[in-house]
Amino acid sequence: MSTDFLFPKIADCSYVSCYCEENVWKLCEQVKRTRPEELGKCYAVFVSNEGRTVPLWRQKAGRGDDQVVIWDYHVFFMHNPLPNRCLVFDLDTTLPFPTYFHKYVTETFRSDLALRPEHHRFFRVIPADTYLIEFSSDRRHMRRPDGSWIKPPPSYPPILSNTNTHCLGDFICMSAGKGPGSVYSLSEFVQNFYKSAHVMAQQNN
C-alpha cells in the first residue's frame, strides 16, 4: 500500500470520537487540498438501515474478542484508484489504516445471512466532491434535551453548506432515490467495489 499514502499516518488525520461524519468530511477536504487529482476516486460511505441498528466488528468501541458494536450509523472513507484496487480508511477500526476493501468488508460486516433482517446493513456511497459541497451539520443530534453535549464536539466550527444548516438525516437515510449518492445492500456494495485480479482478467479475455 506504499503508493496509497493519501494520509501518511492516522495521526495526521482530524479525529473526534463519535463524529465520524465530520472526520470523513475532513479526510475529503485534506485530499482536495493535498491530492486534488485523486478526489474523483474517493467516496464517503454511510452505513445504516431503517431502524438505525447496524452491527460492526473490529471497532475500537466494540466489546469482546470480536470487538463488535451496534451503531445507529457509521461513516468511512474509500479510495478506489483502479477497478481492482479499493482501500478503506476507517478512523474507528482496529484494522490497519488503510485496509484493502475485501479484508475490511469481510472482517467489519461479515455477512447479513446470520443476522436478523432489522440488522442488515445498507450503504450510501457519496462521491467525495459531492460530500464536501452538500454535507451540513449543526451537531444538534449530539445534544441532550437540556442542550448539553452527549459527546464533546470538535473544536472547529460546525460544517455548514450554503443551502442547509443540518442535513445529516438525508445521508443516514437508506431509501433509494432520496439523498445524495447511491444506496446499496451489502452484497451490492461488494459487487460494485470489489473486483479481484482474477475477475478482471476474465472480463478482459
UniProtKB/Swiss-Prot annotation:
Pfam families: Nt_Gln_amidase
Top-level class of the enzyme under EC nomenclature: hydrolase
Keyword entries, A-Z: Hydrolase
Domain of life from the UniProt record: Eukaryota
Enzyme Commission no: 3.5.1.122
InterPro entries to which the protein is assigned, alphabetical: N_Gln_amidohydro_ab_roll_sf, NTAQ1, Prot_N_Gln_amidohydro_ab_roll
Residues annotated as the enzyme's active site: C20, H74, D90
GO molecular function, one term: protein-N-terminal glutamine amidohydrolase activity
Catalytic reactions on record: N-terminal L-glutaminyl-[protein] + H2O = N-terminal L-glutamyl-[protein] + NH4(+)
GO CC annotation, single: cytosol
Subunit architecture: Monomer.
Role this protein plays: Mediates the side-chain deamidation of N-terminal glutamine residues to glutamate, an important step in N-end rule pathway of protein degradation. Conversion of the resulting N-terminal glutamine to glutamate renders the protein susceptible to arginylation, polyubiquitination and degradation as specified by the N-end rule. Does not act on substrates with internal or C-terminal glutamine and does not act on non-glutamine residues in any position.
Family the entry assigns: Belongs to the NTAQ1 family.
Name used for this protein in its record: Protein N-terminal glutamine amidohydrolase
Native organism: Drosophila grimshawi (Hawaiian fruit fly)
Phylogenetic lineage: Eukaryota, Metazoa, Ecdysozoa, Arthropoda, Hexapoda
